[in-house]
Amino acid sequence: MNFLVLFFSYSIFVLPYSILVYGISKDRKCCEYGNSVDSSKILYIAGSVRKRRKTFEKKINVSNFEREGNANGYKHIDNKGIYATKQNLEFDEARNKEANENNKNDATTVNRKIIIESENKNNHNNQEQNIKDCYTNENAQNDEKNKKVKIPKVGNAMPEKKPDWFHVPAPNGEKYKKLKSDLGKLKLHTVCEEAQCPNIGECWNIGTATIMLLGDTCTRGCKFCSIKTSSKPPPPDINEPFNTAKAICEWDINYIVITSVDRDDLPDGGADHFAKTVELIKFSKPSILIECLVSDFQGNIDSIKRLALSGLDVYAHNIETVKRLQKYVRDKRANYEQSLYVLKKAKEINPNLYTKTSIMLGLGETQDEVLQTMKDARSNDIDVITFGQYLRPTKNHLNVVEYISPQMFNYYKDVGLKMGFKYIASGPLVRSSYMAGEYFMKNMVEKGRNQKNQQIKPVELKLVTELDKLTECIQKEIKHREISVFIQVHAFLVNVFVLVRA
């Protein structure tokens, strides 16, 4: 029953009105399309079942402008549905007034139209040309800035091929084979093999190798290094310090470089293991010169002190690259400031040490960044720095951004010597433990030792004379005591013999 009442009420009241509204709205569409509607009026139609139904017209006094969020501000809708800007409308009104006031003929008005339109076009073209000139000037300035400071991206596409100066013969030779067999028998690792150093044949054939302690597995994952990584590497070999000292003392060498993997899993970072190795080598062969290329020990002062006072001659730790590229190249646990801090502290703990660092080039650094790194190293009292070309060990590592020319390596060397570095090894194939640096370090350390010996020589002579006098007195005393003891023993035996006879 209720349903019927609702149906009849809807058909009587609502349906006729909706048809009426639909017809009106269809006949009187919005004047946007200009369908026979007065241009000074816009019809708004609203219909709703719930609200009171009305139709109303809103009159606009200015003209039928329609608001738009653009640069022109408004759009005009004429009877033909053609859009025009407000500026054009004002121009048309001014033109009509001028024509009516002067009462000129059609030819003059047409000519004036042409002149005005041409002037308007010229002004518009001039504005566009000025805008283009502004953009071209900005682009030219940006290009000049980019030319001045062009920072390459880390990990860019590899250059097509290596230059000629990187071609190195395959490692071979009797000393190379002997050294490799000796290392294999004693289960010792070398960074030469693990890091795929290009100088392995040249160095091993003259009896120079860089021993790697604490195993062959690193706890850090730097993006330039090919050494194995693991968060839980095997524990260090207890016999490794003894085996290393034994092997080094058997080789006919006077300079040895000892390095290690990072061992963040150990409480001291492996500093005590390192120091024991140095102490055993120095005890067996005091004349040998030892360079230790170590990790940062996470900035632990006790670890740095333990190694710095172990008897080594050169304390080396590599910065690896410029400050900006640290997070892209090195492990996140290593950083630029910490590396400089370690070298500075080692020098403060033992001023007799020579500190040394190394930087790889070709990773995307700029010349200014390299020079700034050299200044930072020198301000932290670093004595020796080396520069070498980064070479990608495998396809899974960082790409080489560029190959640095030998001329640029020589430039960095000259600038570094002027800064006050005691020595710089700089070249495409130079590495932190390259033999050219070792030759110099050997001479430099020996000069330092000779200077110390010359300073304490008079004291040593006095000590020698005093020792000679003491030894003579001791020998006389021993002889005197030996005679007295012999007499006493002889008298005792005589007395015993007499008693036995009795």
Curated annotation (Swiss-Prot):
[4Fe-4S] cluster 1 binds at residues 192, 197, 203, 433. PROSITE patterns: RADICAL_SAM. Its main location: plastid. Its EC number is 2.8.1.8. Pathway: Protein modification; protein lipoylation via endogenous pathway; protein N(6)-(lipoyl)lysine from octanoyl-[acyl-carrier-protein]: step 2/2. Binds 2 [4Fe-4S] clusters per subunit. One cluster is coordinated with 3 cysteines and an exchangeable S-adenosyl-L-methionine. It is an enzyme of class 2 (transferase). [4Fe-4S] cluster 2 binds at residues 218, 222, 225. GO terms for cellular component: apicoplast; mitochondrion. Its cofactor is [4Fe-4S] cluster. Residues 204-422 form the Radical SAM core domain. It catalyses: [[Fe-S] cluster scaffold protein carrying a second [4Fe-4S](2+) cluster] + N(6)-octanoyl-L-lysyl-[protein] + 2 oxidized [2Fe-2S]-[ferredoxin] + 2 S-adenosyl-L-methionine + 4 H(+) = [[Fe-S] cluster scaffold protein] + N(6)-[(R)-dihydrolipoyl]-L-lysyl-[protein] + 4 Fe(3+) + 2 hydrogen sulfide + 2 5'-deoxyadenosine + 2 L-methionine + 2 reduced [2Fe-2S]-[ferredoxin]. Residues 1-16 form the signal peptide. It is found in: Plastid, Apicoplast. GO terms for molecular function: 4 iron, 4 sulfur cluster binding; lipoate synthase activity; metal ion binding. The keyword Plastid applies. Keywords: 4Fe-4S, Apicoplast, Iron, Iron-sulfur, Metal-binding, Plastid, S-adenosyl-L-methionine, Signal, Transferase. Disulfide bonds: none annotated. Belongs to the radical SAM superfamily. Lipoyl synthase family. PANTHER family: LIPOYL SYNTHASE, LIPOYL SYNTHASE, MITOCHONDRIAL. This is Lipoyl synthase, apicoplast. It comes from Plasmodium yoelii yoelii.
